Every structure is written in C-alpha cells, then in structure tokens.
Amino acid sequence: MVSDGEFTRTQIFGTVFEITNRYTDLNPVGMGAFGLVCSAIDKLTGQNVAVKKIMKPFSTSVLAKRTYRELKLLKHLRHENLITLDDIFLSPLEDIYFVTELQGTDLHRLLTSRPLEKQFIQYFTYQILRGLKYVHSAGVIHRDLKPSNILINENCDLKICDFGLARIQDPQMTGYVSTRYYRAPEIMLTWQKYDTEVDLWSVGCILSEMIEGKPLFPGKDHVHQFSIITELLGSPPPDVIETICSENTLRFVQSLPHRDPIPFSERFAQCSHVEPEAIDLLAKMLIFDPKKRISALDALSHPYMEPYHDPTDEPVCEVKFDWSFNDADLPVDTWRVMMYSEILDFHQIIGAGANGTTQEQMAQIQQEGIQAPSSQYQQTNQEQKVE
C-alpha cells in the first residue's frame, strides 16, 4: 500500500485501487466487465460503502460515453429501490470511482445459496416493480435487469444497480445488450424496436427464477434461447412476426415447427409454495407481444402485490432524464471535460466540495484549450454499439 497525499494506492486482484484517504479497509466483493467493486469503510460517516472502479474510462470514446451516461443516470435517479450515488472522484491515474451504499448480497448469490420462501419472493418482486415504475417514469429503460443487478441487504431492502447500459425510451432502440437468459424476445427478433416492456420481461424471468430456484430460459446461444422460449409460449403470433426487420431472423422463425403454448398453471403446477396470483402475474409479464405485456405501474396493482401495494408511496420521477447527449459522437477529451464538470456539479450539490485533484485536472485541461461542447451536440445517424 502506497500513500500519495490525499490518495492511497493498493493492489486488489492485480488491479490498482487508488482511492481518497476517506475510505479504508478495502475488500473485493465483485468484478464486472467494466469495473471492480470493493467494500470499504467511510471514515467520515463510519458506514460501510461500496467503491466501484471504472476501468480505463477514457481509453475510448465509447467507454467514456458509457461512463458519462452511468454517472448522469446515478445523479438523476434518486429512489429507495435504486442504488444511490454517495460520492465520486477521479484518482491521479485518471480512473473514476463511484461510491454507493453497500448491500450485503445480491439476488444471484441469494438464489444459489437457498430456496426463497414465498414472502421474500413477493416482497422482492414488489420492490423491483416499485423501482422500475420510477425508472420508466423518468424516460429510462434499464435494459440489463438480472439477479446479479438486484442488491439486497440484511433487512431485505432491495436496490436495482448497474445503469451503464440504460437507454432512452425510443421506438428505434438497437442492439443486443442484456444477459441472454433475461433478454426479451423482441430484442432477439428485431434488434430494433423495443421499449420499457423489455424490463418487464426480465422481471418475469427473475420472478420465475425466484419461484423455481433456476433460470427459466437458460439458452446456450441465441437460437437455443428463442427455441426454449417457444416451448413455453408457443410460436410467436403473426403480428409479432411481422415486426421482424432482419430477413435472416424472419427466415429462421418461419422455419421453426409450430408450437402450441403451455398454460402457465400447468407449467408451474408443482410450485405449490407460491400463490396462484404469482403465476398469473408471471403470465402477464412473459408475453411475446410487448404491447400486451403488463407495465410496472399496472403490475403494482396486480392482486399478487396487494399486501405491499400503496399508491401513495410509489413515487415517479418528477423530471424526465435529459438524453440530449446520447447521440453525440464526441472525442475522448470532450467526454473527459464533460465528466469532470458533472463530478464538480455533484460535489457542489451534496455540499462536500470536489477533491483537489479533480479541480486541478479540470484547470489543466482547460489550459490545454479543450473546451466543453455547447448544448448542440454533434449528431450521428446511429449510436455506436456498446457491448
């Protein structure tokens, strides 16, 4: 461990963690595609926190944009069932660190450790839907809901995390993004048109996994994934097939043998440990046609949610998220300036003041003549794909 003024440098899993002296007792808790997460103690508050290092955020414009998007979303979305950003800073090595509250575990770990009792299944489903109602009201789609992105503490308080892949509500959404098991069929079928309903499909997959203790659609690849979906739901209806934009995908779907759907009451007949209302809600989430899929708002009013549903305590986001930056095709240096500006703004909002390193870096790049973009971003016909 090396101390350098306000920062302490240590190696964890071969990764350099360079954090402010405010945080001590680092211990690794998880590794993702875009960063390493450690638990730590916040000396200022005495609380346990999670510190997420974003790996090489300025190595490419795509990664810089992804990090900027996640930061903007974490600043904007403030809800009891969403992870809360408590601090953010840049290290002397120009790595970015997000500090959030520390949850004891995630749903994936919980599901692999023991079966869930029905009251926990119900309460966790309610909290996911409560958080999603807020997210969708802000004009945001999560796009990557899965058990490992559902954090839970010892009091069974649940928080949705990892908004790095979140996107604007847009009828021309593109690309594969979510983990395959939880991916809505319209993403696989069209690669083009989808909306908030993709998140409800993911919730249905998560609810089923909580009920049975194993993934509902464990596809080995995209073809197998779609095939096992049709084993339960039957062949997609004609109006869904008509929305398929790819000729290759259309030919593949049309080549499949016709399958009749299996009633959910029959498929989950052995799941006597949960209420029939849970299976009914599941059937309303896992529908081929996204237009017929239940919304988060309506799902909260479903009889299965009745023990927890309280319309006066299920808030929406008062201000839509500003996606004006999202189609911008900007160089890394510009994203860097924008990122520094957002970090300074965050510290001004929370009243803590930005750390000196950030202010010095901001002054330095301004001296180098790199200017932040105007409100009119350079537009591109299509956003670069983020994997």
Curated annotation (Swiss-Prot):
ATP binds at residues 29-37, 52. The modification Phosphotyrosine is found at residue 176. Residues 360-387 are annotated as: Disordered. PROSITE patterns: MAPK (PS01351), PROTEIN_KINASE_ATP (PS00107), PROTEIN_KINASE_DOM (PS50011), PROTEIN_KINASE_ST (PS00108). Keywords: Activator, ATP-binding, Cytoplasm, Kinase, Nucleotide-binding, Nucleus, Phosphoprotein, Serine/threonine-protein kinase, Transcription, Transcription regulation, Transferase. Transmembrane segments: none annotated. It is found in: Cytoplasm; Nucleus. It catalyses: L-seryl-[protein] + ATP = O-phospho-L-seryl-[protein] + ADP + H(+); L-threonyl-[protein] + ATP = O-phospho-L-threonyl-[protein] + ADP + H(+). Residues 23-305 form the Protein kinase domain. The active site is at 144 (proton acceptor). InterPro entries: Kinase-like_dom_sf (IPR011009), MAP_kinase (IPR050117), MAP_kinase_CS (IPR003527), MAPK_Sty1/Hog1 (IPR038783), Prot_kinase_dom (IPR000719), Protein_kinase_ATP_BS (IPR017441), Ser/Thr_kinase_AS (IPR008271). A motif (TXY) lies at residues 174-176. GO terms for molecular function: ATP binding; calmodulin binding; chromatin binding; MAP kinase activity; protein serine kinase activity; RNA polymerase II CTD heptapeptide repeat kinase activity. Its cofactor is Mg(2+). GO terms for cellular component: chromatin; mitochondrial intermembrane space; nucleus. The modification Phosphothreonine is found at residue 174. Disulfide bonds: none annotated. The TXY motif contains the threonine and tyrosine residues whose phosphorylation activates the MAP kinases. Proline-directed serine/threonine-protein kinase involved in a signal transduction pathway that is activated by changes in the osmolarity of the extracellular environment. Controls osmotic regulation of transcription of target genes. Belongs to the protein kinase superfamily. Ser/Thr protein kinase family. MAP kinase subfamily. HOG1 sub-subfamily. This is Mitogen-activated protein kinase HOG1. It comes from Debaryomyces hansenii (strain ATCC 36239 / CBS 767 / BCRC 21394 / JCM 1990 / NBRC 0083 / IGC 2968) (Yeast). The gene is HOG1.
